[in-house]
């Protein structure tokens, strides 16, 4: 009885799944080094954004996100700022986990990019169901789209298996 040989697409799909969900999480990273730099940049930006919200939540909500806090009663405006702060704490925790992965558990870098992508996608879904009233064209929209692009690029590059120089040079 002959067994069917898996085709190339099945092998690469299995390889991608193994890189996304590794059996062992250690520091043996196989993806592009550029993805590591992208993750580091994203950690820095997300951490800066989160700290800014925690320190000056009202100002950030109005200027960066275009939320007209002055048009709401004081209690409602305070609740909006508190929800922003809670979101910032969650982002800081994810950023801390990203730092741990970047330093000690690099095999999980693709999984972290996937987590960041899922976080963004679910945030967009929630934003469609419960839209936030904004004034003008807030810069946070452009920044978030930039971070989305970097997340997708980082995910692709982290899954892209790095070849050794000898493999590139030899025919």
State the predicted function of each range.
Residues 100-120:
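Cytoplasmic juxtamembrane regions at transmembrane-helix boundaries
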Residues 66-67, 133-146:
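Non-cytosolic membrane-interface motifs at loop->transmembrane helix junctions
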Residues 20-34, 75-85, 103-107, 134-138:
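Juxtamembrane loop-transmembrane helix junctions in multi-pass integral membrane proteins
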Residues 64-99:
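Core segments of alpha-helical transmembrane spans in multipass integral membrane proteins
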Residues 45-48, 117-127:
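Aromatic-anchored segments of alpha-helical transmembrane domains
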Residues 149-169:
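Membrane-water interface at the C-terminal end of transmembrane alpha helices
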Residues 30-59:
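N-terminal signal-anchor transmembrane alpha helix
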Residues 1-28:
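Short, Lys/Arg-rich, polar N-terminal cytosolic tail immediately upstream
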């Amino acid at each position: 009885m002959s067994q069917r040989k898996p085709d190339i697409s099945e092998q690469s799909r299995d390889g991608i799944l193994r890189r996304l969900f590794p059996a062992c999480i250690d520091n043996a990273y196989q993806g592009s080094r550029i993805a590591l730099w992208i993750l580091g940049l994203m950690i820095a930006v997300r951490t800066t954004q989160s700290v800014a919200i925690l320190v000056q939540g009202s100002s950030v909500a109005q200027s960066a996100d275009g939320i007209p806090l002055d048009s709401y009663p004081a209690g409602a405006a305070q609740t909006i700022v508190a929800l922003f702060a809670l979101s910032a704490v969650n982002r800081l925790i994810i950023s801390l986990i990203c730092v741990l992965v970047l330093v000690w558990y690099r095999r999980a870098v693709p999984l972290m990019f996937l987590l960041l992508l899922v976080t963004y996608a679910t945030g967009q879904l929630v934003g469609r169901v419960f839209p936030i009233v904004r004034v003008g064209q807030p810069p946070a929209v452009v920044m978030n789209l930039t971070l989305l692009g970097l997340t997708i690029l980082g995910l692709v590059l982290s899954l892209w298996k790095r070849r050794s120089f000898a493999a590139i040079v030899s025919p």
